[in-house]
């Protein structure tokens, strides 16, 4: 039976080894039996360039390479934490990078995939920040900086982001319903799968089904399994 897995918001980092362990277990036990695995952003807690090296990164690269070498496809859509993950990483691991929005035929259902941050248009400050950091010229300049300086800048941005979240209402950090429906209609989709909000749920909207992936924590994972029988969270 053909099976697809969807995950997002693992926020892999050295301070939470249990989450890395859970991911590696998933890669060893479930992923090898899949037709494809889709990682929908914020895979890493932050990513400052494909030249960064660590034990965690090496473990993840090895697991991805082993999976793709076995014939299982692995696709990646960047999130707001790992949008600098690039072609070098993709070549090293065998994953395929996708655009911000990707349309997939999933057992006859037109399914739209995205990280989810682009749907949260009510968070105006974040959307302004996103437009700036996605400028290719600015990214090129940042990646030109020494690795140690990039780490300091990323840590500063992350601290500010955490502080800003405390001052934002929960509503503006969720998707805008009208914009989301418009985007789904634009792609002619019947289903939408996204992450980012950390609010695992299935929403049966008027003309489509919206499936939200949850974030990973030391005590639980959020894995969406889709096969010809339907979908379920593991």
Swiss-Prot record:
Its main location: membrane. Its cofactor is Mn(2+). InterPro entries: Calcineurin-like_PHP_ApaH, LpxH-like, Metallo-depent_PP-like, UDP-diacylglucosamine_Hdrlase. Its EC number is 3.6.1.54. Binds 2 Mn(2+) ions per subunit in a binuclear metal center. Mn(2+) 1 binds at residues 9, 11, 42, 198. PANTHER family: UDP-2,3-DIACYLGLUCOSAMINE HYDROLASE, UDP-2,3-DIACYLGLUCOSAMINE HYDROLASE-RELATED. Belongs to the LpxH family. This is UDP-2,3-diacylglucosamine hydrolase. It comes from Haemophilus ducreyi (strain 35000HP / ATCC 700724).
């Amino acid at each position: 039976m053909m099976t697809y897995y969807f995950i997002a918001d693992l926020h892999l980092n050295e301070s939470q080894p249990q989450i890395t362990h859970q991911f590696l277990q998933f890669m060893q036990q479930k992923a090898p039996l899949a037709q494809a695995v889709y990682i929908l952003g914020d895979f890493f807690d932050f990513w400052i360039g494909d030249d960064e090296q660590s034990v965690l990164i090496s473990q993840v690269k090895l697991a991805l390479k082993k999976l793709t070498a076995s014939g299982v496809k692995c696709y990646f859509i960047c999130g707001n934490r790992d949008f600098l993950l690039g072609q070098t990483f993709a070549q090293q691991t065998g994953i395929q990078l996708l655009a911000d929005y990707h349309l997939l035929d999933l057992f006859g259902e037109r399914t739209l995939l995205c990280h989810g941050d682009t749907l949260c248009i009510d968070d105006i400050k974040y959307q302004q920040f996103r437009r700036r950091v996605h400028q290719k010229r600015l990214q090129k300049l940042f990646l030109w900086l020494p690795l140690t300086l990039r780490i300091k800048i990323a840590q500063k941005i992350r601290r500010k982001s955490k502080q800003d979240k405390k001052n934002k209402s929960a509503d503006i950090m969720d998707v805008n319903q009208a914009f989301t429906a418009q985007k789904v209609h634009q792609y002619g989709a019947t289903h939408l799968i996204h992450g980012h909000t950390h609010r695992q749920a299935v929403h049966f909207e008027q003309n489509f089904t919206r499936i939200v992936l949850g974030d990973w924590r030391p005590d639980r994972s959020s894995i969406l399994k889709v096969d010809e029988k339907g979908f379920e969270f593991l």
